[in-house]
């Protein structure tokens, strides 16, 4: 039996990444959306949606990244999204990196805070994301990332 609505897994770490992800919510109209973030209190902003909380980790903590990657893997396994959308950082990269394993397409929207160059996660995500976006026109390139406007 085919799904009635597409399933979206929206992923962002804390702070500005989460704020930017919240600005993309109108694009998910009509979809079944689940969220992944690093702070449980963000659940108040997405009532009626499933919220998964993963540990926050940086590139400086390999063990922390491994634990977070395992958490993201299990979330993808349970949610089985059609699409993964993220504004970064580490949890979003992990989700984009693994999305294809589950047959999901992935979209990376690099944070508007990265005005001079793409974030490290954003540069890495370009290899795996079906849609790879920057919010700064001067950072766009012919092979990606592409510019389609800003969310803030």
What does each model-found stretch correspond to?
Residues 1-38, 42:
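N-terminal subdomain of nucleotide-sugar transferases
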Residues 7, 32-35, 50, 105, ...:
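Residues at the starts of beta-strands that form the adenosine-phosphate
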Residues 12, 30-71, 138, 148-151:
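Conserved nucleotide-sugar phosphate-binding/catalytic loop shared by glycosyltransferases and other
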Residues 14, 89, 110-113:
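Histidine-centered beta-alpha loop that forms part of the nucleotide-sugar donor binding/catalytic region
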Residues 104-152:
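Active-site-proximal region of nucleotide-activated glycan assembly enzymes
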């Amino acid at each position: 039996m085919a799904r009635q609505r597409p399933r979206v897994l929206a992923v962002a770490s804390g702070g500005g990444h989460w704020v930017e992800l919240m600005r993309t919510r109108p694009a998910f109209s009509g979809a079944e959306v689940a969220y992944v973030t690093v702070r449980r209190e963000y659940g108040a902003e997405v009532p009626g949606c499933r919220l998964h909380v993963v540990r926050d980790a940086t590139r400086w903590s390999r063990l922390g990244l491994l634990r977070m990657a395992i958490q993201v893997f299990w979330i993808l396994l349970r949610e089985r999204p059609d699409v993964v959308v993220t504004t970064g950082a580490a949890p979003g990269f992990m989700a984009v990196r693994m999305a294809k394993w589950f047959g999901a397409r992935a979209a990376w929207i690099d944070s508007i805070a990265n005005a001079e160059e793409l974030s490290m996660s954003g540069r890495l995500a370009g290899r795996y994301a079906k849609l790879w976006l920057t919010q700064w026109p001067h950072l766009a390139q012919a092979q990606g990332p592409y510019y389609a406007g800003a969310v803030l």
